[in-house]
């Protein structure tokens, strides 16, 4: 029987529910259990695909082409699992499916209401994740905080789950904040008491508390919280601010979190405890890196940390392999000019230009890429970065001065980057991109193929609607550009490289989505190898 763990949050947002859920997932997985991660987002958008990165952060893409919350990236990187369309559900998706059923007459004339129709659809999404994965454990994170009006249907649905699948098969974990008042040098438990009271008022009694705090919580405060919340003191877990993300699962294990979860759910794991030795070595390496490598990231959304979180994480993963700390200098593309690019790049070991949409900042990206190419600074382009590298090459090597992308200038004479043929007639923005996992055939003798351990074919995740214009392929090749990765039918350019440079590779896909702390993605691995000049070191 599948076990269901629901992770909720109270007091404030951004408490780290996703990290808590991921860390528990990692511990259970390392006990030999099959774990599926799931995130419920209470916003009414169908998905985050059309949302402003400044509001939502990065849009994560799964193998099956789902545009999802960035927490799925945490799940994949920390737990080392692959997520899917069943892993991210929004209020918008729920209402869309319910309304489609109503229009088809599936409800046979009944009045469609939040209870039972919306809550039943939410439960169906939870159950579907279990049925499609055959998992031992489903860990579902509920976005927002307890008491939010948007989260109410989700809270009601998970309350009902206890009755539907049995009390022994459901566990509620509630994350709260225990703030420290510096003026009084005192920790306050009242916010946690109120948050749990709110949760209990809707019929959910938490079975475990995870307390976020700046410093360790003494026994007196834990006893007080236990008295007020009816949660046994041995199931109150501290989540102290940690210097490294890798510390969190290890700290949870020290407190016996995974064992307590297994005991509560009567869950027998293949291994008596989580084997975290490899994780400990990774944590030790991450804390004691002996070198530094500076990478300049030129992007459109650099003011928000979460906008490029998979990219910066992938850079760090590669850094662990080379025993080097990656210092990422984020530069707003709009601020770059021919006059200041040398100053911006003077101490940089490498340049990365990640994905994005729209026309803002494109000229700054092109200027930065030109500087990297002319000065043989290792360069990695991703999605929009690949497109701008192509435009830069056309302008400054092929001397096509008006070369551009059709996204920036639809009527451009030399549109090096053009809209994909099957996307020309699309009227909507949402859900109309080339999304998900696609194969690419790698050319023999290229640095790209070497980066992927000489594989013939790779599978990578995409999110774009523009592509390289094939009518320029011959001219590019004559000028020295190598198309080192193409679609199996040779119709789509997936990767370009300049073989005479130290490292100048750009990909139409998003390699960052498949990077893992213990398995850096191929292009990132080779990019940091070239930028650092260091030998790889096994963990």
UniProtKB/Swiss-Prot annotation:
Binding site for ATP: 14-19, 71
EC number: 6.3.4.2
Associated pathway: Pyrimidine metabolism; CTP biosynthesis via de novo pathway; CTP from UDP: step 2/2
Keyword Transmembrane helix: no
Example GO molecular function: metal ion binding
Nucleotide-binding as UniProt keyword: yes
Catalytic activity reported: UTP + L-glutamine + ATP + H2O = CTP + L-glutamate + ADP + phosphate + 2 H(+); L-glutamine + H2O = L-glutamate + NH4(+); UTP + NH4(+) + ATP = CTP + ADP + phosphate + 2 H(+)
Binding site for Mg(2+): 71, 141
Keywords, in A-Z order: ATP-binding, Glutamine amidotransferase, Ligase, Magnesium, Metal-binding, Nucleotide-binding, Pyrimidine biosynthesis
Binding site for L-glutamine: 54, 356, 384-387, 407, 465
GO CC entries: cytosol
Binding residues annotated for CTP, in chain numbering: 13, 148-150, 188-193, 224
Annotated catalytic residues: 383 (nucleophile), 510, 512
GO biological process, one term: 'de novo' CTP biosynthetic process
Residues that bind UTP: 13, 188-193, 224
Annotated control of activity: Allosterically activated by GTP, when glutamine is the substrate; GTP has no effect on the reaction when ammonia is the substrate. The allosteric effector GTP functions by stabilizing the protein conformation that binds the tetrahedral intermediate(s) formed during glutamine hydrolysis. Inhibited by the product CTP, via allosteric rather than competitive inhibition.
Ranges of residues in domain Glutamine amidotransferase type-1: 294-537
CDD domains registered for this protein in UniProt: CTPS_N, GATase1_CTP_Synthase
InterPro entries linked to this entry: Class_I_gatase-like, CTP_synthase, CTP_synthase_N, GATASE, GATase1_CTP_Synthase, P-loop_NTPase
Residues covered by region (Amidoligase domain): 1-267
Source organism, top-level taxon: Bacteria
Further comment found in the protein's record: CTPSs have evolved a hybrid strategy for distinguishing between UTP and CTP. The overlapping regions of the product feedback inhibitory and substrate sites recognize a common feature in both compounds, the triphosphate moiety. To differentiate isosteric substrate and product pyrimidine rings, an additional pocket far from the expected kinase/ligase catalytic site, specifically recognizes the cytosine and ribose portions of the product inhibitor.
Assembly, per entry: Homotetramer.
Function: Catalyzes the ATP-dependent amination of UTP to CTP with either L-glutamine or ammonia as the source of nitrogen. Regulates intracellular CTP levels through interactions with the four ribonucleotide triphosphates.
Family of this protein: Belongs to the CTP synthase family.
Full protein name: CTP synthase
Organism of origin: Lactobacillus acidophilus (strain ATCC 700396 / NCK56 / N2 / NCFM)
């Amino acid at each position: 029987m599948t076990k269901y763990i629901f992770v909720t949050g109270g007091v404030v947002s951004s408490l780290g529910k996703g990290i808590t859920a991921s860390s528990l997932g990692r511990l259970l997985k390392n006990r030999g259990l099959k774990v599926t991660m799931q995130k419920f987002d209470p916003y009414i958008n169908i998905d985050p695909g059309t949302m402003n990165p400044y509001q939502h952060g990065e849009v994560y893409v799964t193998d099956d082409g789902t545009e999802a919350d960035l927490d799925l990236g945490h799940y994949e990187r920390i737990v080392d699992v692959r997520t899917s369309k069943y892993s991210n559900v929004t209020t918008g998706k729920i209402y869309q499916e319910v309304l489609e059923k109503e229009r088809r007459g599936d409800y046979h004339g009944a009045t469609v209401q939040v209870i039972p129709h919306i809550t039943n659809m939410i439960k169906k999404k939870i159950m579907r994740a279990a049925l499609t994965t055959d998992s031992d454990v489903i860990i579902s994170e509920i976005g927002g905080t307890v008491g939010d009006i948007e989260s109410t249907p989700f809270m009601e649905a998970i309350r009902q789950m206890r009755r539907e699948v049995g009390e022994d098969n459901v566990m509620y974990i509630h994350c709260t904040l225990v703030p420290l008042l510096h003026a009084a040098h005192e920790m306050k438990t009242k916010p946690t008491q109120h948050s749990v009271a709110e949760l209990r008022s809707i019929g959910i009694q938490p079975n475990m508390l995870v307390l976020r705090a700046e410093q360790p919580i003494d026994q007196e405060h834990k006893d007080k919280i236990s008295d007020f919340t009816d949660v046994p003191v041995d199931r109150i877990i501290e989540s102290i601010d940690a210097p490294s993300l890798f510390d969190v699962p290890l700290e949870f294990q020290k407190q016996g979190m995974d064992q307590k979860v297994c005991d509560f759910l009567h869950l027998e794991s293949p291994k008596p405890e989580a084997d975290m030795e490899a994780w400990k070595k990774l944590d030790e390496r991450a804390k004691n890196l002996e070198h530094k490598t500076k990478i300049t990231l030129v992007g459109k959304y650099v003011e928000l940390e979460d906008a490029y979180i998979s990219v910066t994480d992938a850079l760090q993963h590669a850094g662990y392999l080379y025993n080097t700390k990656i210092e990422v200098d984020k530069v707003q593309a709009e601020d770059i000019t021919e006059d200041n690019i040398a100053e911006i790049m003077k101490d940089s070991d490498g340049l990365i230009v990640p994905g994005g949409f729209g026309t803002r900042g494109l000229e700054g990206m092109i200027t930065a890429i030109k500087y990297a190419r002319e000065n043989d600074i290792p360069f990695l382009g991703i999605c929009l970065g690949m497109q701008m590298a192509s435009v830069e090459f056309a302008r400054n090597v092929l001397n096509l001065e008006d070369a551009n992308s059709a996204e920036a200038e639809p009527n451009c004479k030399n549109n090096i980057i053009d809209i994909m043929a099957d996307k020309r007639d699309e009227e909507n923005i949402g859900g109309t991109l080339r999304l998900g996992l696609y194969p690419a055939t790698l050319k023999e003798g290229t640095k790209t193929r070497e980066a992927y351990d000489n594989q013939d074919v790779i599978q990578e995740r995409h999110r774009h609607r523009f592509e390289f214009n094939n009518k320029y392929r011959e001219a590019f090749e004559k000028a020295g550009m190598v198309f080192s990765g193409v679609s199996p039918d040779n119709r789509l350019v997936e990767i370009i490289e300049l073989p005479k440079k130290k490292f100048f590779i750009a990909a139409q896909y998003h390699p960052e989505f498949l990077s893992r702390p213990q398995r850096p993605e191929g292009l990132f691995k080779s990019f940091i190898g070239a930028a650092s000049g260091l030998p790889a070191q096994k963990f």
